[in-house]
């Protein structure tokens, strides 16, 4: 069963993928910045391999984004 947090995480990954493409950043460029293989980025963006929070933050950094927390 997928939790609401997993669904949110998957949605964030998809939005980040769209942003990366808008910025014309390739998966290879992201992979180089993260010191992983291009295939790892492909799997992450297609949600066949959900990254740890640390890897997701590295991904965000490599495409020029960051997480901002706010009180709810």
Language model regions located:
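Short alpha-helical DNA-recognition segment
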Residues: 24-42
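Short alpha-helical segments used as structural interaction elements across diverse proteins
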Residues: 12-17, 40, 52
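A detector for short, charged/polar N-terminal pre-domain segments
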Residues: 1-11
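Short basic helix-loop element that most often maps to the first helix and adjoining turn
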Residues: 14-29, 58
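DNA major-groove recognition helix of helix-turn-helix/homeodomain DNA-binding modules
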Residues: 52-70
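Short intrinsically disordered terminal tails
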Residues: 1, 71-72
